[in-house]
């Protein structure tokens, strides 16, 4: 066993009667003994399916309390879990399988029903924490003779997560048992977590935020966990009060919704004496200062901003609870952070450049990446721009890359463009992020039509409809703009920053 699986196993076996994870949709707490039953049942399933060390299981499920036990069962055997969005269209799910040949998929009833390939065997699985469909590639599994049952090592991968690249092809981040345990330990220590804490998880379980920052750090601290299907502004404060939630990790969009939602404000007014939040952690993109102050004043709860990413298995910097600096991403914690200017790494105050990170929780390469330009001399180059102030606090000032950040989701423009290119009336296009008060950025499709000035309303609606049916919800354009030509450089490349400024300057509307 690895240090990670030993810790997780001991936690369940040493506290059998303790309630440790609650599923909000089921309105039920699960004891450590019940979770251990699920771990055993899933582990037996994986073994019966001829899975072993190094195999990858694709998981496409809604948020629930089953995720921690799927992980633990798989990690005990050296199996790697790759969670993806449950809103992934069936075409996307099959494309993933065609590329990576997963021997087993755990998914929803709807996606299993749409999966009609005869080579796959489908069966229902019920455990304490969830019901799901199991799709097995019988052609791969039935005649296996080379299953690896050797001892799992700390350097073995346990989790694969997708992170968007500028090419539009998602990059796969492989996180080892060692990396995840280190990251979760840093998270727990920096946020002073104890077994008296209860974390509420609203972020999707195919994100590093939910997987490591919230779930795994809580288990490292022997804290309790409340898993919700998704964020609900109107139910937020009731959930916090009823379940004695002490902290939650969010994106700035959630902070905005809580401030704006009348039901949320009314609920807080009724329940204020029952709310015991120590802090709310906010990351993904900067929270406007006036919104941060408004939240802290209205809800009497500290907001801690930090900076992290999938490649770091969680956070790299965080504001100290006793000395937060509004507008900053805080101080490095468990991470070396430098600013790259030309070929020189520096931490000099005021030096603006690309943020580079290094640490025992940071990956050293992407999976299947033949050109590791993001890695240099042991540093991971984030593609984000920033600087340190005179006190060593990091300020993130934008992205060197073109990735769109929408409510915490990362959207690759090239991927959206490749899908929309199927529409015959698009002559040229560029997908960019435009400022949005709630989501940080909105996915905006800018195009030159084959019929300029004609049928724009119909074409706009067709793009929005086509996007909703062919892309994940967070990738779908919510805004469409028409232009006669794009700003370009001397080689013909579209100048996206100039295009963005052009739309802002003319006050373009949806």
Predicted segments with their positions:
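Conserved AMP-binding A3 loop
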Residues: 29-33, 158-182
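Gly/Ser/Thr-rich phosphate-binding loop
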Residues: 245-250, 259, 263-325, 336-338
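Conserved ATP/PPi-binding loop(s) of AMP-dependent carboxylate-activating enzymes
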Residues: 324, 331-334, 344-375, 409-411
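AMP-binding/adenylate-forming catalytic domain of the ANL superfamily
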Residues: 471-493
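Conserved pre-ATP/AMP-binding loop-to-beta segment of ANL
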Residues: 16-17, 143-162, 169, 192-198
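Conserved AMP-binding/adenylate-forming core of the ANL superfamily
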Residues: 20-50, 55-64, 68-72, 89-94, ...
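Conserved AMP-binding/adenylation subdomain of ANL enzymes
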Residues: 181-198, 208-247, 261-262, 267
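AMP-binding/adenylate-forming catalytic core of the ANL superfamily
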Residues: 88, 359, 364-365, 385-474, ...
């Amino acid at each position: 066993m690895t240090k990670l699986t030993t810790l997780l196993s001991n936690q369940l076996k040493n506290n059998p009667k303790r309630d440790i994870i609650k599923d909000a949709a089921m309105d039920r707490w699960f004891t450590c003994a019940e979770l251990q039953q699920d771990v055993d049942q899933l582990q037996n399933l994986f073994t019966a399916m001829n899975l072993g060390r190094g195999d990858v299981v694709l998981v496409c499920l809604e948020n629930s309390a089953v995720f921690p036990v799927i992980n633990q069962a798989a990690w005990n055997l050296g199996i790697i879990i790759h969670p993806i969005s449950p809103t992934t269209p069936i075409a996307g799910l099959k494309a993933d399988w065609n590329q990576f040949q997963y021997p087993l998929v755990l998914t929803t009833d709807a996606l299993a029903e749409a999966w009609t390939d005869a080579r796959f065997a489908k069966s229902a699985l019920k455990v304490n924490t969830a019901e799901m469909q199991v799709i097995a590639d019988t052609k791969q599994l039935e005649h296996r003779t080379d299953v690896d049952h050797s001892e799992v090592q700390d350097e073995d991968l346990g989790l694969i997560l997708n992170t968007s690249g500028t090419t539009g092809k998602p990059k796969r981040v492989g996180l080892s048992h060692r990396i995840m345990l280190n990251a979760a330990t840093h998270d727990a220590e920096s946020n002073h977590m104890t077994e008296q804490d209860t974390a509420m998880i609203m972020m999707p379980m195919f994100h590093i935020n939910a997987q490591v920052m919230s779930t795994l750090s809580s288990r490292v601290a022997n804290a309790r966990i409340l898993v919700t299907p998704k964020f609900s502004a109107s139910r937020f404060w009731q959930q916090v009060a009823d379940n004695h939630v002490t902290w939650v990790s969010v994106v700035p969009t959630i902070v905005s919704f809580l401030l704006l939602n009348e039901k949320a404000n009314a609920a807080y007014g009724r329940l204020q004496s029952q709310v015991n939040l120590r802090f709310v952690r906010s990351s993904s993109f900067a929270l406007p200062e006036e919104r941060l102050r408004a939240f802290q004043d209205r809800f009497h709860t500290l907001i801690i901003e930090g900076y992290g990413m999938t490649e770091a298995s969680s956070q790299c910097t965080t504001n100290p609870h006793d000395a937060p600096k509004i507008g900053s991403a805080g101080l490095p914690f468990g991470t070396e952070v430098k600013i790259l200017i030309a070929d020189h790494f520096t931490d000099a105050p005021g030096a603006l450049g690309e943020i580079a990170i290094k640490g025992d929780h940071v990956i050293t390469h992407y999976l299947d990446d033949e050109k590791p330009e993001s890695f240099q001399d042991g540093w991971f180059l984030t593609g984000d721009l920033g600087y340190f102030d005179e006190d060593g606090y990091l300020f993130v000032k934008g992205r060197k890359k073109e990735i769109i950040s929408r409510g915490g989701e990362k959207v690759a423009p090239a991927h959206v463009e490749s899908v929309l290119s199927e529409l015959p009336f698009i002559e040229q296009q560029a997908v960019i992020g435009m400022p949005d008060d709630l989501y940080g950025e909105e996915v905006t499709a800018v195009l030159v039509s084959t019929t300029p000035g004609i049928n724009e309303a119909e074409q706009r609606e067709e793009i929005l409809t086509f996007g909703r049916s062919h892309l994940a919800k967070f990738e779908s354009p919510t805004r469409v703009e028409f232009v006669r030509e794009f700003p370009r450089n001397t080689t013909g490349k579209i100048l996206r920053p100039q295009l963005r400024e052009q739309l802002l300057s003319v006050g373009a509307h949806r």
